[in-house]
UniProtKB/Swiss-Prot annotation:
InterPro entries in UniProt: ACP, ACP-like_sf, PP-bd_ACP, Ppantetheine_attach_site
Gene name as annotated: acpP
GO cellular component, one term: membrane
Keyword Aminoacyl-tRNA synthetase: no
Protein name: Acyl carrier protein
Residue span, Carrier domain: 2-77
Protein family (similarity comment): Belongs to the acyl carrier protein (ACP) family.
Length: 78
């Protein structure tokens, strides 16, 4: 597991208040982890802060799973 993957999962656990065992790469923030729209906004903000990047709203709307968040950060950190 990469550092980015580990950190993204830690942020998901912190922001959504779920157990780390529940967080799989294919987990949907809304469908699997019970996030609402405010949760997803706060999650994106936490990712931006942790990885020192900006995620535009139109890009954030496309990030709906843990793996999509990991891929987005990896592409920007490349």
């Amino acid at each position: 597991m990469s550092d980015i993957e580990t950190r993204v999962k830690e942020i998901v656990v912190e922001q959504l208040g779920v157990n780390s065992e529940e967080v799989a790469n294919e987990s949907s923030f809304v469908d699997d982890l019970g996030a609402d729209s405010l949760d997803t906004v706060e999650l994106v903000m936490a990712l931006e802060e942790a990885f020192e990047c900006e995620i535009p709203d139109e890009e954030a709307e496309k990030i709906s799973t843990v793996q999509e968040a990991i891929n987005y950060i990896k592409e920007r950190q490349g």
